[in-house]
């Protein structure tokens, strides 16, 4: 990260690795218990961990006071997408996938429902959360 990024965002970025690991473990074992499907559990765990890894620094950047640093949206190297919306969409989508898998055995329908939930979450959250 750039020198202009607040230390709290840097700290959150470092901690997001650990948080992502524990989120992955929790989602994997929880989904495995609920569905009994190893593939869906692995997919849900990986994608949810990535979502947590993206969302945690975004959340920390929202708390950066004016003048103390630059938030993620203002740093040219971070890209032009909405970190909060992407992170939350990557968390909600897999959780919906697991929920649908509990009642539906067709994996294409299950993955489609999760993908649709992620897309809807992204669009809604992008409009609600600050950049």
What spans do the regions from the language model cover?
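Transmembrane alpha-helical segments of multi-pass membrane proteins
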Residues: 48, 73-90
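Hydrophobic alpha-helical transmembrane segments
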Residues: 38-43, 107-113
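Membrane-helix boundary connector in multi-pass membrane proteins
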Residues: 91-112
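Haloarchaeal acidic low-complexity proteome signature biased toward cell-envelope/secretome components but also
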Residues: 1-25, 61-81, 127-131
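Alpha-helical transmembrane segments and their immediate juxtamembrane interface regions
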Residues: 113-131
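Membrane-helix boundary elements
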Residues: 19-50
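Generic alpha-helical transmembrane segments
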Residues: 40-62, 117-121
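Hydrophobic, membrane-inserted alpha-helices
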Residues: 22-29, 90-98
């Amino acid at each position: 990260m750039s020198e202009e990024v607040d230390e709290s965002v840097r700290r959150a970025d470092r901690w997001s690795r650990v948080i992502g690991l524990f989120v992955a473990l929790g989602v994997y074992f929880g989904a495995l218990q609920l569905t009994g499907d190893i593939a869906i559990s692995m997919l849900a765990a990986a994608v949810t961990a990535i979502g947590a890894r993206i969302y945690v620094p975004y959340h920390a950047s929202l708390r950066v006071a004016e003048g103390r640093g630059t938030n993620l949206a203002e740093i040219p190297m971070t890209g032009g997408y909405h970190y909060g919306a992407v992170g939350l969409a990557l968390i909600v989508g897999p959780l919906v996938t697991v929920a649908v898998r509990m009642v539906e055995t067709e994996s294409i329908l299950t993955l489609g429902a999760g993908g649709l939930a992620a897309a809807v979450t992204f669009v809604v959250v992008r409009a609600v959360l600050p950049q």
